[in-house]
Amino acid sequence: VSNLRLNLTDFLELLHLDYVKLRLDENHTFQEFFSTEDSQIRVQSSVVARELLFNIQDISILTNALTTVVQTIGDSYSTNTFYKEILKSILSHSNFVHFVKKDETSAMVILDFYNSVRNTPFCQNDPLFWEQFASACIDANRFPEAESCLKTAFSKASIIPGYVPYQVETVQARYILNAFIYNFSTHTTSAEDVIKCLNSSYEHLFKYYDHPDNILAYVFNVSKSYAEVWKLSKSLLDGNQIFQFQSTIREILNRLKSYCITTGNTLENSPVYI
């Protein structure tokens, strides 16, 4: 499900599970669900794989295994490109969105996982890790922690020659928008706060819009939050502020239309239809 591309030998070595293959070979129930041919370990069905993962009773079983993998290969990633790609896949917050949104306990287990590996050689100096950690915090509505992670991501990126933090900027925009929406009902909000949210998030979201590696689908997915910001706060705005907000949305729509033309997509099938 997470596309780690590990074969059976990798799993046995990284998790120190020398007995597993024997159990797989002799247990007919395991063989109904798993295949170990050609030194590969596969779940027989992608549907079964997703159900097994998403319905795990104790999410800490998963995070403990992932922590072991990260700590085991953390010292070798610099000389092994394959291991580096594995680390990137494991640390992607998209693996955990289902669990973070499931309940508060699961969310805390996921955040504990990120905390448990933050000081490993790969994670502590990698902007990607801190960006993914921030994204998981945003998913869990833990905005102070997200802000701290983003500051660290920008700091680590600044000392890497030639590193362009385009995706960190996108996550920063997502943080600003989601924090505004989450806090709207519990904090006194002024029209100036709305415009500050609008301008600041837009600046981050489109700062590296033209960078060739920027993931524009993600940029536009984040931009859909403007619709919720507008819905919540439009009654606070005066005529000039309404015009400013709508002008910004029109500019985003124009960029979206250009994106759809370039990719051969349609507005209805685009990442966000505002």
Where are these regions (language model features)?
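C-terminal leucine-rich, beta-strand-based interaction scaffolds used for sensing/assembly
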Residues: 3-159, 166-170
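Sequence-level detector for tyrosine residue identity
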Residues: 19, 33, 77, 83, ...
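Charged/polar, low-hydrophobicity segments characteristic of intrinsically disordered regions
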Residues: 19-40, 205-214, 257-270
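Alpha-helical repeat scaffolds
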Residues: 65-70, 102-120, 143-158, 184-210, ...
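Residues that mark the junctions of alpha-helical repeat units in TPR/alpha-solenoid scaffolds
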Residues: 83, 110, 119-126, 163-172, ...
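Structural register within alpha-helical repeat arrays
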Residues: 86-97, 132-133, 172, 176-179, ...
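Short secondary-structure transition/capping segments
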Residues: 123-136, 171-180, 257-269
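Long, compositionally biased intrinsically disordered regions
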Residues: 134, 138, 147, 151, ...
